[in-house]
UniProtKB/Swiss-Prot annotation:
Keyword flag Phosphoprotein: yes
Gene for this chain: Tomm70
SMART domains: TPR (SM00028)
Compositional bias (Low complexity): 93-108
Annotated region (Disordered), positions in chain: 69-109
Function, as annotated: Acts as a receptor of the preprotein translocase complex of the outer mitochondrial membrane (TOM complex). Recognizes and mediates the translocation of mitochondrial preproteins from the cytosol into the mitochondria in a chaperone dependent manner. Mediates TBK1 and IRF3 activation induced by MAVS in response to Sendai virus infection and promotes host antiviral responses during virus infection.
GO biological process: activation of innate immune response; cellular response to virus; negative regulation of cell growth involved in cardiac muscle cell development; positive regulation of defense response to virus by host; positive regulation of interferon-beta production; positive regulation of protein targeting to mitochondrion; protein import into mitochondrial matrix; protein insertion into mitochondrial inner membrane
Entry protein name: Mitochondrial import receptor subunit TOM70
Cytoplasmic side: 63-610
Length: 610
């Protein structure tokens, strides 16, 4: 399957960071056949029946049944409030000193609790008047007067004092008082949320995450403020963890299927073309099966030979020999080495090689254009769309007849939500390469998503008809079937979508992502968890480097309540991530699962099962 991921990334971008593998395949975020393939993450969530909250891939997965149970039947003592956060302190007014309970004015000796309530009421008046220091004094008096067995009242006094400290931006005191309140009333949502905000200000991200996770669950995921804070801290934690991990990661060569799919998205790429006659000798392989000798002592030609034999681990070293010797094929070797640096997720190593190829005015223009495409894609992965656009435009300027420029720029335009411009680029690619099935399939998908988003039924039907024409004209294009399957799934035509995925598997039996998509379809279509997991497990069996399979398996295990297994799956995906951005997203999933595990233990919340 060639390049489904970049097409869907535009639609998924609003829901989650792209699941890219850091390789500039046919566009914006990942190599084809990698990452999340054609299915946006909100589709993954729908397929497994899980709420996908917020926009950064920070998934809190909790069953709807559990949410309803948690939201209902809980008394005021829990502190649960469905509305947005109150800005005023809590507590009803107590009888004033010298007033009897019947309002007669009879002077009665007040109990300790009554005096504490009176002090709190006075503090509330100071709070509303913006006199926070005086309010704190009153709340402190209330705490000292309140009987120690009155947990609910004491927790309110501590929470109110924390609110006053919050107005003074005394975050340490806020956290301390909220902790006291929560110790007295463990499910006190207001105190938990206020402490979460204090932890955020104190840069205690993990503590903030745990508190806000508890709030989200206890509120039944109904309060936007708490969900936004959860999303924010998960993003920060994910980026922080990924930055450290990515620096020290071991480069990892993707599967042969991944690499073949990647190169299949290029048609004007000199370095991926078969070796020409005369570039290698006519000698047979020796009895030990060693590579054929090349006529010239060229590291680049040896690298090309290894590439044809799928002996990918030796390519970078052979290219380096050509470059060090300043050989005849130095420009080609630089580009091939850069490409494999990208494939193993070493963008920092790739960039100098790409820069040098681009600057070689005497080099073949197609080499320079290809380097610009790959550097432009890399910039997009690094969230630098202006630099990316500049590189693609320069590529079009120096090599206007290069179909790859328009194909890959079309992917960029989709990521930038410029669908009409994307379609124009796909059309330009098709004019130059009428038999390039991938561009035709992706054009159909872009038109379909545009019509689907606009709820234009006639254009949706036209796009669906376009898919039929593409698969009829190009029956060997697995990507056509895969993209059509996603459109069919959107249209609730699950049976036909399943047939399309079967076609993909027939054409590319080693493409693990297709099995993941088919597995997700079983969940969405038939709620057949066993079949879905069987297919995703098959994907891992086929390609144990398929990060998308591990990520999806982890997501499902969270929904099943198997947090330990989910965390294990997310960690495996993290180790396979080929971009820092993708790794950050995966860390956010893993951190969310960790937080839910801790909250479930602390508050006695049993993880749900599907």
């Amino acid at each position: 399957m060639a390049a489904s991921k970049p097409v869907e990334a535009a639609m998924a971008a609003a829901a989650a960071p792209a699941s890219g593998n850091g390789v500039g395949s046919s566009g914006g975020t990942a190599a084809p056949g990698s990452g999340a393939g054609t299915l946006p993450r909100w589709h993954v969530a729908l397929a497994i029946g899980a709420p996908l909250l917020l926009g950064a891939g920070a998934m809190y997965l909790w069953s709807r049944r559990r949410r309803r149970r948690e939201a209902g039947g809980r008394g005021d003592a829990s502190g649960l409030k469905r509305n947005s956060e109150r800005k005023t302190p809590e507590g009803r007014a107590s009888p004033a000193l010298g007033s009897g309970p019947d309002g007669s004015g009879d002077s009665l000796e007040m109990s300790s609790l009554d005096r504490a309530q009176a002090a709190k009421n006075k503090g509330n008046k100071y709070f509303k008047a913006g006199k926070y220091e005086q309010a704190i004094q009153c709340y402190t008096e209330a705490i000292s007067l309140c009987p120690t067995e009155k947990n609910a009242d004491l927790s309110t006094f501590y929470q109110n004092r924390a609110a006053a400290f919050e107005q003074l931006q005394k975050w340490k005191e806020v956290a301390q008082d909220c902790t006291k309140a929560v110790e007295l009333n463990p499910k006190y949502v207001k105190a938990l949320f206020r402490r979460a905000k204090a932890h955020e200000k104190l840069d205690n991200k993990k503590e903030c995450l745990e508190d806000v996770t508890a709030v989200c669950i206890l509120e039944g995921f109904q309060n936007e403020q708490s969900m936004l804070l959860a999303d924010k801290v998960l993003k920060l934690l994910g980026k922080e963890n990924a930055k450290e991990k990515y620096k020290n990661r071991e480069p990892l060569m993707p599967s042969p299927q991944f690499i073949k799919s990647y190169f299949s998205s290029f048609t004007d790429d000199i370095i991926s073309q078969p070796m020409l006659k005369g570039e290698k000798s006519d000698e047979d392989k020796d009895k030990e099966g060693e590579a054929l000798e090349v006529k010239e002592n060229s590291g680049y030609l040896k690298a090309k030979q290894y590439m044809e034999e799928e002996n990918y681990d030796k390519i970078i070293s052979e290219c380096s020999k050509e470059i060090d010797a300043q050989g005849k094929y130095m420009a080609e070797a630089l580009l091939l080495r850069a490409t494999f640096y990208l494939l193993i997720g070493s963008a920092n190593a790739a960039k100098p090689d790409l820069d040098k190829v681009i600057s070689l005015k005497e080099a073949n223009v197609k080499l320079r254009a290809n380097a610009l495409i790959k550097r432009g894609t890399m910039c997009m992965q690094q969230q630098q769309p202006m630099l990316s656009t500049q590189d693609f435009n320069m590529a079009a300027e120096i090599d206007p007849m290069n179909s790859d420029v328009y194909h890959h720029r079309g992917q960029l335009k989709i990521l930038l939500d410029l669908v009409e411009e994307a379609v124009a680029d796909f059309d330009a690619c098709i004019r130059l390469r009428p038999k390039f099935a991938l561009a035709q399939a992706q054009k159909c998908f872009a038109l379909y998503r545009q019509a689907y988003t606009a709820n234009n039924s006639s254009q949706v039907q036209a796009a669906m008809k376009g898919f039929e024409e593409v698969i009829k004209k190009f029956p060997r294009c697995a990507e056509g079937y895969a993209l059509y399957a996603q459109a069919l799934t959107d249209q609730q035509q699950f049976g036909k979508a399943d047939e399309m995925y079967d076609k993909c598997i027939d054409l590319e039996p080693d493409n693990a992502t297709t099995y993941v998509h088919k597995g997700l379809l079983q969940l969405q279509w038939k709620q057949d968890l066993d079949k879905g997991l069987e297919l995703i497990s098959k994907a891992i069996e086929i390609d144990n480097k398929c990060d998308f399979a591990y990520e999806t398996m982890g997501t499902i295990e969270v929904q099943r309540g198997n947090m330990e297994k989910a965390i294990d799956m997310f960690n495996k995906a993290i180790n396979l991530a080929k971009s820092e951005m993708e790794m950050a997203h995966l860390y956010s999933l893993c951190d969310a699962a960790h937080a839910q595990t801790e909250v479930a233990k602390k508050y006695g919340l049993k993880p749900p099962t599907l």
